[in-house]
From Swiss-Prot:
InterPro entries: Acyl_CoA_acyltransferase, Leu/Phe-tRNA_Trfase, Leu/Phe-tRNA_Trfase_C, Leu/Phe-tRNA_Trfase_N. This is Leucyl/phenylalanyl-tRNA--protein transferase. Its main location: cytoplasm. It holds the Pfam family Leu_Phe_trans.
Amino acid sequence: MTKRLSPQLLIYGYAQGIFPMDEDGQIYWYDPDPRAIIPLDERFHVSSSLQRTIRRQTFEIRFDTAFRETMQACSERDETWISQEFIEIYSQLHAGGLAHSVEAWQDGEMVGGLYGVGLAGLFAGESMWSKARDASKVALVALVERLRAGGFQLLDTQFITPHLATFGAYEIPRAEYKQLLVKALQCSATF
């Protein structure tokens, strides 16, 4: 348990393979076993219906234009681990070029997106939101394309969900995750 967060503490945590969540005003650090990742190779799967949505260009995808708003939207649920303190600290990481958002826009309005932390060749996906069908899914596909182009090695999703499994996300033992993390932190990548 931690009382306060700082950008430096967050970066240290991600480099060790742990991540924070706020529960009832207390900050806890997690190191799940197993750990979920999304493959950045040919195992990443996009359904044919989602491919059609992407081809129709239903959404305009933007990167890092509404980071704070993306986090705020991710936090607006009945139960959330994203406190205002988290929004402030991650926004500081964003200002330093280490946290990023992918936003789906439609008719001038942001209708979905995601955010996460990029550290060397690691991208730790933190949360997604959507108020238009497929908006966050299209944002995830755009994220994977960007990570591939930038030389990222590891897309950490922390926990598996049925939604992420449709893209090919899978679980690996903590020890294997730590090995992949060490390799990812040794490479240079650009978001």
